[in-house]
Amino acid sequence: IVGKHRRLLIINSYNESAPWSQELITPILLQTSPIEDITADVVHMNGTFIRNDSLYIRMENGIFERFQDKKPDYLVLLGNMAFTLRERILSEWGNIPIVLVGNEDTYAPREYYFTGRPIHISNAITSPLVDLRPQYNFTFIETPYMYKETIDMMVQMLPKMKTIVFAADELYHNQDLDRLIHAYITSKYPNLHYERLIGNERNQNELQAYLLNDEPETGMLFSTWFYERKNLLGFPTLISGDFQLVA
């Protein structure tokens, strides 16, 4: 219908402070803002806080309650976790066009994407995204992990490096990266020592010690560094700026 007002909804798997998400959200909003018959909205799933099924369901219900009177015509899903909403999307909003931007061309049960998930959950429960094409109207854009290229560059630029420290929070993809990075270093750079520093309140001082120590034998490989801490009123607060204290 010519001239019909359309709604675009961006569902971000992460929080609004995540640089990767904002690098995608901002251009979309800039492109759509001059178009009079399109309204673009953004909702953040805040995956850092989602550690169990109860929290996931609260988040899911919150999204669909918020947009029950302004159903989207198009969807952009940022991060593979957002694609776990696909059945609810199909049920409540219909088989609308979806653009999924993610790191993996696979899908898994929602518990696979929970923050701090058990380490024993393996990639064996993932399946190819292509299997879902007959059921859902989606286009997938992959933003692959670049850990191999980054490590190779670090080795070239830091010839004295003997240890690589992977500093990252408990988001599911960092658990995957931990395994992938460790395997890559073991196979290609067996003389390098590998350490994993998990982003949480207990390791805040350790992170600062690494960053303040000008040690050419240690290389820092960063991913996301977000974690939850309760404020004075007992409500969860997202901590995101630890590295900025000394960077």
Regions found by a protein language model. Name each.
Residues 1-247:
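Short hydrophobic alpha-helices and adjacent helix-cap/hinge residues
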